[in-house]
A protein has these predicted regions:
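Conserved, mostly hydrophobic/aromatic
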Residues: 23, 47, 51, 91, ...
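Structural preference for beta-strand elements that scaffold enzyme active sites
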Residues: 20-22, 54, 96-102, 176-178, ...
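Non-globular sequence segments
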Residues: 104-168, 172
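Catalytic domains of carbohydrate-active enzymes, especially glycoside hydrolases
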Residues: 40-63, 171-176
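Alpha-helix-loop-beta-strand connector modules within alpha/beta enzyme cores
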Residues: 72-99, 193-230
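N-terminal amphipathic alpha-helix/helix-capping segment at the start of soluble metabolic enzymes
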Residues: 1-22, 91, 221
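Glycine-rich, proline-tolerant flexible connector loops at the mouths of alpha/beta enzymes
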Residues: 56-81, 103-121, 178-204
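Short, acidic/polar
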Residues: 36-47, 157-167
Length: 233
């Protein structure tokens, strides 16, 4: 009987997985100032022994204001990098599963309450929330704070932040990067004709709406080794 494709190896741009079971990134809301905690060692560590072909670390913000919540993981600072390196060191001491990471920016859906904290929705600025950004000054819903519409300087800065995070991923020895361009977060919102009402070269036509997301992809690809896979969700 032929082995089902699910259990056969697959080559992802040189990264050979022993099977096609991938553990998707799952937010844990357990970081402190973007830094991985002991919980991440336990959470990721036990998954690394599951027998899956690939483990992808949760949505990881490329800058502080790009976090979904204050408890989200980040990779914008040396402190973030050191904390995640310690988690990976502990895991790799005992497991050899390939490990990737999802890099993202929450955009207008950032600065929400930590799930399970007893409150829901956006956190007010005077209670620890922060300014959100997006392609246009349109809140995710009527209850959500209106984001500041990004100018080209903002976009250039975010592109650089993605590239810098990718460089940190190289130093961390990660095997794969997945860019988060779904769920209405920043890259996704630029693609949406509903969220993106811009009248410049970043809005309107599909070609224009893809301009910023493609700039992110290009910058990350340039910072990330060509023999390591890069994907987009």
């Amino acid at each position: 009987m032929q082995t089902p494709n699910l259990f056969q190896p697959i080559d992802l741009n040189g990264l050979v997985l022993p099977n096609r079971i991938v553990i998707a990134p799952m937010c844990q809301y357990s970081a402190v100032d973007g830094c991985a905690s002991d919980w991440h060692t336990i959470h990721l560590g036990h998954l690394a022994f599951s027998g899956a072909g690939l483990l992808i670390i949760e949505a990881t913000a490329v800058e502080a204001r790009g976090r979904i919540s204050a408890g989200c993981l980040g990779l914008w600072s040396d402190e973030n990098e050191v904390a995640l390196a310690d988690v990976l060191r502990r895991i790799r001491k005992h497991a050899n599963m390939p490990i990737g990471i999802q890099l993202g920016h929450a955009g207008r859906k950032a600065s929400i309450s930590i799930p399970g904290s007893g409150t829901r929705g956006p956190v007010p600025l005077d209670q620890g929330g922060w300014e959100t950004i997006g392609p246009s000054p349109l809140g995710f819903t009527e209850e959500w704070r209106e984001p500041r519409a990004m100018n080209e300087t903002d976009m250039d800065d975010v592109v650089v932040r993605f590239a810098e995070a990718a460089s940190r991923c190289v130093r961390l020895g990660l095997d794969l990067i997945e860019l988060h361009s779904a769920h209405g977060y920043l890259m996704s919102s630029f693609l949406s004709a509903l969220a993106n009402r811009r009248e410049d070269r970043f809005g309107g036509s599909l070609e224009n709406r893809t301009r910023f997301p493609l700039a992110v992809v290009s910058a990350v690809r340039a910072a990330w080794p060509s023999d390591r896979p890069l994907g987009v969700r």
